[in-house]
Every structure is written in C-alpha cells, then in structure tokens.
Amino acid sequence: MAFAVWFLSTFVIVAAQRHMALEHEGTYNIGGVLTNSDSEEHFRTTIAHLNFDQQYVPRKVTYYEKTIRMDKNPIKTVFNVCNKLIEKRVYAVVVSHEQTSGDLSPAAVSYTSGFYSIPVIGISSRDAAFSDKNIHVSFLRTVPPYYHQADVWLEMLSHFSYTKVIIIHSSDTDGRAILGRFQTTSQTYYDDVDVRATVEMIVEFEPKLTSFSEHLTYMKTAQSRVYLMYASTEDAQIIFRDARDHNMTQEGHVWIVTEQALFANNTPEGVLGLQLEHAHSDKGHIRDSVYVLASAIKEMISNETIAEAPKDCGDSAVNWESGKRLFQYLKTRNITGETGQVAFDDNGDRIYAGYDVINIRENQKQHVVGKFSYDNMRAKMRMKINDSEIIWAGKQKRKPEGIMIPTHLKLLTIEEKPFVYVRRMGDDEFHCEPNERPCPLFNTTDATANEFCCSGYCIDLLIELAKRINFTYDLALSPDGQFGHYILRNNTGATLRKEWTGLIGQLVNERADMIVAPLTINPERAEYIEFSKPFKYQGITILEKKPSRSSTLVSFLQPFSNTLWILVMVSVHVVALVLYLLDRFSPFGRFKLSHSDSNEEKALNLSSAVWFAWGVLLNSGIGEGTPRSFSARVLGMVWAGFAMIIVASYTANLAAFLVLERPKTKLSGINDARLRNTMENLTCATVKGSSVDMYFRRQVELSNMYRTMEANNYATAEHAIQDVKKGKLMAFIWDSSRLEYEASKDCELVTAGELFGRSGYGIGLQKGSPWTDAVTLAILEFHESGFMEKLDKQWIFHGHVQQNCELFEKTPNTLGLKNMAGVFILVGVGIAGGVGLIIIEVIYKKHQVKKQKRLDIARHAADKWRGTIEKRKTIRASLAMQRQYNVGLNSRAPGTISLAVDKKRYPRLSQRMGPERAWPGDAAEVLRMRRPYEIGKPGQSPKVIGGPPHPMLGKTRPQAQQNLLPPRYSPGYTSDVSHLVV
C-alpha cells in the first residue's frame, strides 16, 4: 500500500513537470534580417513547412518567424534588432546582406546578438573577420569564408602535381588569412600525399593597386611559374594588365585565382578560378540555416531544458546560458541541405562547401572543367577535374610544367672513394685533368686553398648525364663535409627547430639544385628531397681485417692440442717402463742360456728402453738395446704402429696449419652473437648521422647493438677504415659499395657476412624538381646500355687487383723462420742441454777425482804403514840371516854363502826365487847388490851410488820388486862385508 502511494505521487510530480516543459517548449521565435521581400517570404514559407516536418520538429513544438529588412546603416540595423527581434524573444537570427553593401550591417547584427548570446547564422557573409570568435562570439555561416579557397588550391596543386608556387595576396585580413590557411593546411595535408607543394615566393600588395610591374619583375627571378592569387576584382584587373605587358600570361605560365579575381574584365585566357556553388542562392541558404537551427534545438530539448531567450536590450546583466549551449549544438550539425552537405568547424564556418573549377576561355567565357564536392561514400571532399577540357595559357592543351627549367645547375658532391676522389690543385695548376672536374670548397676563407679537382665514379656519371639531358653545371664540395642528418638547432635563441645539415640541408634550403654523390635513398631523406632511380644498388655490410694466424715460437706444436702432446709424452715413458719390465721379468730376457754364446745380446735396461721408445717414435735407427723377450717385442711392434700414426697425423696437420689458406673472416654477419651482445674486446662503429646510423636507429632489434656502438662512431668513413687497417677497430659497418672497393684494393681487408639493409644510391634533387624525371630516365638507359656496369668495373671492383688477391689467397703460405723458429730453438735447446749435461758431468767427474785422490792418499798411508811393518820384518830377517851366515861360516866350506831366507817371513822372495833357494853368484856380485841406493823424488827410480850397477839394478823395478831388497837404513843393517871370508 505504501509503495502504491509513493508510485502515484511520483508519477503526478513527473507528469506535472513534463506538462510545464511542454508548455514551455511550445513556441520558438526565429528572427530574420534579410535583404528583400522575396527572401522574407521564403523565410516565412520555410518555417511554415518546418512545423510540419516531424523529423526536425517534436510534437507540440512550433516555430514562428520574426523578420526585419537589412539596412545599409549599421546603427539602424542595431536598433531594429533590439526593438523588433530581441523584444520578441528570438532564439536565433538568420542574417543576409547585399554583396555591394559591405559587411558592416551583418557585423552589427552579430555584435548585438552576440552580446546576449543569441546565435546568428549568416548566409552571405564570407569575410575572414567573422571567424574571430573573440569578436563574433555566436556567429555561424552556411557559406565558407574566402580564405577557405586555400583548401581547394591544395587539391588542385596535388592534382596537377605542381610542387612550387608563388602566392600573390592583398595585405588585408582576408589576404593574410588565405596565406596562413594555405601554409597551415599544407603541413597536415601533405602527410598523406606523395607530392608536397612549397611556396617559393610570397608577394603581398596593398589593396587598390595602381601598378604591379615591380612585383612582376621580382617574380620573374623565381623558378616557379604557378601563381596563386587572392585579390579583389579591381586589383586583379591591374595585376592582369601588367602581367600581360611582362609576357607572364603566355605559354608556360599558370594562374589559379579566387572568386573575386575571376570576374575581372581582363582575365587572361587559360586562367583557372573557383566559383562557390550556390553562392547567390539565398533561398537555399535560408532553408539550410532554418533546418540546421531546428536540428540543434531538437537535440537540445531532448538533453536539457532551454531557458527563455532575453527580451530587453537594456538589461546588460542578462546572461543567457541556453544561448551559449545552443551555439555549441549548432556547431555539431551535419545535415544534407539544398546547398550540399552542411557542417561547421570550431569557428562556426561552413565546411564541405562545393566549388566549380572555372577555366577562362576566349572572350572571357567561363567553362566549368571540374568540381570540388562532397563524396558521401568517403565522407570527405573530392576533386574531379577533366584535364582534356582545360585550355591553358597560350591556347595550349598540354599541361605546363609549372616551373622555369634552368639549364645551368648548382651541383654539390662529397669526397667518398671510389665514387668521388678529391685532389687539391697545386699552386702552379690552373686546370684539372681531362677526367676531372673543378669542385671548389666555398666554406674556407683561404682563397688559395679552396680549389680542388674531383674524379671518380660519380664524376663520370655526371659527365655522361649532362651530355644526355643537356644541362651545364657548377660543381662544389659539401661545405661541412657531411651527407647530412636531421638535428635540433637553436635558431632564435629561444626555440629549438629540427633541420638538415650537410648536403641534404643545402638541397632543402635551395642552395643547390642537385647532389651527385653516393647518396643513400632512405625514408628520412625522401620526405624532404627527391631521389632519382638508383644508379647503384647496394646494402650495408661489415669490413674487418683478415684474421692472420699468429706464428709463435711453438707454431710447430699447433697440429696437436696440449692434451694430446702431454698424452704422447706420457705414453713414451710408460711404454719404455713396460718394455723394461717385460724384458726383465721374462725368462728369456733376464738370464742367459747355459749353452749361449758369450757374445749374446745383453738384457734391456731402463735407459735402453727409454732410448728405444723415443727412437721408434722419432723414426731413428735403433742398432742396439732392443727388447729380447717376445712379449716386449710385441709391445714394441704395437708402439711402432702407434708412432707411425702419430707422426703421419702430425705431418698432415702441420701442413694444414702452416701451409693452407687462412680463414676468411672472424664475424659471420650482422646476426653474429658477438655483435648483438657486444663484448669489450670487440669494437664496431659506423659514421655519425649517416644513412647507416639512421638505419640502426630505426631497427628495434638492433637497438642494443646501436647503443654500444654509438659512442664509437666516427666522423668520416676514411678515418674508420684506417683504424680497421691498424687493428684499432674490429668491425666497420658501412655501405657495401665502398667496403667492397676497399676489400678489392687491400688484400688484408675482407667484408663479412651477407648484405643487409638493402637500398641504393640515387641522385638527390629538390622537391618537385623538373629534372627528376629526366635524370631517372637517363639512369635507366645507362643501366640498359651497360654504362653503369662499366663504371663498376672501372672504379669499384678493380678487376686486376681483385684477381691478385684471389691468387694470393690460393697460393700456399711459404714457411719462414718465424713459422719454424720453434724447431730451431728446440735444436738449440737440445745443444744447450747437451752442453749443460757435459758441464755437469765434468763437474761431477772432478768431484769424483778429488774423492778418489783422498782415497788414494789414505790407501798410500796404509801402504806406507804396511811398508814400515815389512821393513821391520826385513831387518829382523837380515839379522837372522846374518846370524845364520855367521853360523854358516863356522860350519861350511869356504867359497859358499848361504842366502837362505825364511819362506814365511819373506813371501815375495819365495814367490820369485822359490823356497830354500840360495842366491847364485860370488861375493863380489853380492857386494854390488848391496851397494846403497839414492832415493830420489817420489815417482823416480832409485839410483845406485858409486860403481857400475848390476844389470838388474839399472832398470826401474816395480814397487813390488823394490820391496824385495832390505832397506838400506833399516835399524841393525850394515854394509860392511869385510868380515866375510871367501
């Protein structure tokens, strides 16, 4: 029950509010300030018909018309608007005026209505001043302003492919507005078009001209022959008159003018002009303005409540917000009306207005040759021109070029081998060689040092190009020595502006007509200059120095790895040890057979086993010290096979390492991992601001590599190439043509990997240059005739040099001392080792000799001691003999002497003379034998003192024999034999 009460109360309140709103929505007064009764009548009829059009008028909504006549006096117009329109609470005003009365009266209506925020829709005012919303705050118009014709100019220039124009305009508001519109719109318009029109010259004049000759003389110096003119009808007559006198309305000149100039009474034949469709159809514009207003009010009613319009001009405090909102709704309208598609821009100016393209024929006849109209399918304006119906100046049917084609051109080039070689002229030189062309450098103040001569691939191309398409030229070098890149520069001290430097900057700023150089075609440059078809196709590649195999002192060890060498060394000694053990423990190796010959081979010792193992490995003859046992000899045969394989493998690999050709490159190309992940020991670079630099900046996948190489980039390619040769730079990334030339010239350089970033070299020209097509056609003919191939062979590939490089690569490397120095050093080490060992042996031997001497001294002392003992024994024996002798004298017969010696006490005597043997001879002989000896120095034989010695005593006796005689000075010895009795 409570819910039902709440629902009914809510429904009653909403219904009451809706009823009040409908009562308020019931009537809307539309004011009209019109020029004549026909317009007023048509205005009333249109509103009457509108009330029955349910598409635009909601139920219970009715429109009423309130009209006044436009007065030429703007003050009266203001009073009429206040007293006859605003007092009637008009929600909007439609205003028109006569073209001859000026725009003061419509401006008065706009000021007055705008003060109270009442929207005003103009149907005839086209002055640029009404676009200023600071003054005309609530003014819209169903006709476009005059300066919107600049949009149609751009479409026409694009259709005719004119790229350079001269703009002629008056210095009033509309004249400057059309220039600003052209310049502003062209910046965005040409983003979608290939051909960009540039303003070569702007000629501004004061209205109400009396003469235009001075301006025409100045215009003749320009290259463009396309004139876009905004002028009043009176000023246009003066301009056309003087242009005819200067022959500037003849063949080759193109005049495109606005509506006012088109109606001059002396408009030359061939002039193209614009005529707004429905420009004088007040009835059509009245209807469209009323329906636009009804459409806006309908949408506003559905969204919000419209407050009552102001009623009193005397109330200055009135602020009608609904009027401001209604003005915003009006600007968003887009309907199809009697005058075409009706829509507005932010300034309230009509867009999508249609124009007829008028061609002036003989006797001032106007002929429509095209239309600029709204395309419903594409929802935008579209230009259609029938070129075949146009009669151009000089009664020509063929479209003029639109520019004066100069036959003497200013050309620029840059030093880049082999395309352009630059040679400074000597002090005594006045002319270049026949194959050279003068190319001065104009950025130096030294007048004696700026004369150069240029030759090369591009110079030969230029000479042939000039002959083919018939032009003369002045050639100069790039002022800053750069191809050019797009950088930010501070021009005025407060603003930064991006502009081109180098050759591109000279061309963009029109300081040169053509660039003849190895200029890479890329999107950044093509946006600002024209390119011919490529005269040489190329790409980007990498230049590096060929990797040379380092010849160290151990180059002969390169065939085997260190591990293999160690294994071979270990194997030699392991095999030697096993051979020794096998031969030692074999029953046929350690012991000799019982019936064997005494000359049988000795068993293998460890030293001989090592000698055998090395001898087999080094293939030296082994004469002795071979294994004796069968098991050891089997191992020896296996070791010999191993040695044969090792030596053969070493020999083959040595030839591969030292004789065969070197590896080509270190890098595999741009995708080499060492480039993508640049290491500290691998440096790569290109030239700053070059096309290659731009390429790397464009490629996202190369961004990491570019950040690394950016700090290493060089100012010139020449400097970078020199650093590659010196080994300071490992990889230089540059145009393939230049790098292939460098590689063909120097056998130590090589290009790595495949080409990437393929493009071409083209001739650079200004945007819209008349020479572009001619140069392109000539280059295509050169390709077909083989002329470009001839230039390639002559300047880039250097066939004979490249052939020498190939011969050098295929020829085996000759081994030199550097390659095999290690072997000689090894021999030297062996010799030094042998000398060292012999020195060690000598030192060791001296040590042994000293030791032996000490042993000999000790042995001599021992022998001397033993000798002393023997002497004592001998003395005792002598005494015993003497006693026996004395006894014998007493017992034996005279004439005999007994010399018997005890065998046990005199073993030496017994060995020589036998036991119990008497000395033969008489007493005289005994006496001779008993003579004293003179003992000389050590090592000398003893001498007999006095008388001739016995034959036996004259000889040097061995030590053993000398000891047979008793010592002379033994105690108890006497030589006196006088007591003997014979």
Swiss-Prot record:
Glycine binds at P518, L519, T520, R525, S691, D735. InterPro entries: ANF_lig-bd_rcpt, CaM-bd_C0_NMDA_rcpt_NR1, Glu/Gly-bd, Iono_Glu_rcpt_met, Ionotropic_Glu_rcpt, Iontro_rcpt_C, NMDA1-like_ligand-bd, NMDA1-like_N. It holds the Pfam family CaM_bdg_C0. Residues 934-982 are annotated as: Disordered. The keyword NADP does not apply. GO terms for biological process: calcium ion homeostasis; chemical synaptic transmission; ionotropic glutamate receptor signaling pathway; long-term memory; olfactory learning; regulation of membrane potential. It is a multi-pass membrane protein. It is found in: Cell membrane; Postsynaptic cell membrane; Postsynaptic density. Residues 972-982 have a biased composition (Polar residues). Its main location: membrane. Glycans are attached at N247, N303, N334, N386, N443, N470, N490, N681. Keywords: Calcium, Cell membrane, Disulfide bond, Glycoprotein, Ion channel, Ion transport, Ligand-gated ion channel, Magnesium, Membrane, Phosphoprotein, Postsynaptic cell membrane, Receptor, Signal, Synapse, Transmembrane, Transmembrane helix, Transport. GO terms for molecular function: glutamate-gated receptor activity. GO terms for cellular component: NMDA selective glutamate receptor complex; postsynaptic density; postsynaptic membrane. CDD domains: PBP1_iGluR_NMDA_NR1, PBP2_iGluR_NMDA_Nr1. The chain crosses the membrane at residues 562-582, 640-660, 820-840. Residues 17-561, 661-819 are extracellular. Residues 1-16 form the signal peptide. Residues 583-639, 841-982 are cytoplasmic. NMDA receptor subtype of glutamate-gated ion channels with high calcium permeability and voltage-dependent sensitivity to magnesium. Mediated by glycine. This protein plays a key role in synaptic plasticity, synaptogenesis, excitotoxicity, memory acquisition and learning. It mediates neuronal functions in glutamate neurotransmission. Is involved in the cell surface targeting of NMDA receptors. Plays a role in associative learning and in long-term memory consolidation. Forms a heteromeric NMDA channel with Nmdar2. Belongs to the glutamate-gated ion channel (TC 1.A.10.1) family. This is Glutamate [NMDA] receptor subunit 1. It comes from Drosophila willistoni (Fruit fly).
